């Protein structure tokens, strides 16, 4: 599969160039995270500090634009892959392990203990401690339900698949986590 990664492109701009993407022989397009962000700036990293598990942000586009993109891409046989951020939320600008004030209050109950990772060569620390942002307890059943609802909504819009950001920071099933099984 030939995947074109259109990092930070607006959904409407991608939709407009679908015929050209097909002409160039691509089978899929990976889009940037479409979750809410802590402000409307254009810095790339804002997309990787989500405030919610909802579709739409000022940088990439709205849910309606995602549906239009998926419909247009589908008509050309092109799959849409959405980059998603589920391990952490946006941090406060000064206290990075504290959630930003714009983080969805419903998600705050799913935050993990705010202990910083001090050894990135220690697998347990990388999968159970914070890596510079407020981290979610991805093994919490309530959080998993929220994630599943979000992914189902993306699939209903026509998204074909996902790229999961920070995958190395999730424990595997053989390490006692069922999170990745819930996603599949």
Predicted features along the sequence, with ranges:
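Substrate-binding/active-site clefts of carbohydrate-active enzymes
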Residues: 2-5, 9-16, 24-26, 30-157, ...
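Outer-membrane beta-barrel proteins
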Residues: 169-172
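Short catalytic-loop micro-motif centered on adjacent basic/acidic residues
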Residues: 3-5, 162-167
């Amino acid at each position: 599969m030939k995947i074109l990664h259109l990092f930070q492109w607006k959904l409407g701009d991608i939709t407009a160039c679908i015929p050209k993407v097909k002409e160039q022989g691509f089978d899929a397009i990976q889009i940037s995270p479409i979750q809410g962000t802590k402000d409307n700036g254009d810095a790339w990293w804002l997309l990787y500090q989500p405030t919610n598990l909802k579709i739409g942000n000022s940088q990439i586009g709205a849910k309606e634009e995602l549906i239009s993109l998926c419909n247009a891409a589908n008509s050309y046989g092109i799959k849409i892959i959405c980059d998603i951020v589920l391990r952490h939320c946006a941090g406060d600008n000064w206290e990075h392990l504290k959630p930003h004030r714009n983080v969805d209050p419903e998600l705050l109950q799913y935050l993990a203990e705010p202990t910083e990772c001090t050894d990135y060569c220690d697998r347990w620390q990388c999968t159970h401690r914070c890596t510079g942002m407020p981290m979610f307890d991805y093994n919490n059943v309530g959080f998993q339900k929220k994630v599943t609802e979000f992914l189902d909504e993306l699939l209903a819009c026509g998204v074909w698949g996902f790229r999961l950001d920070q995958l190395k920071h999730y424990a595997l099933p053989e390490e006692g986590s069922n999170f990745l099984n819930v996603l599949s």
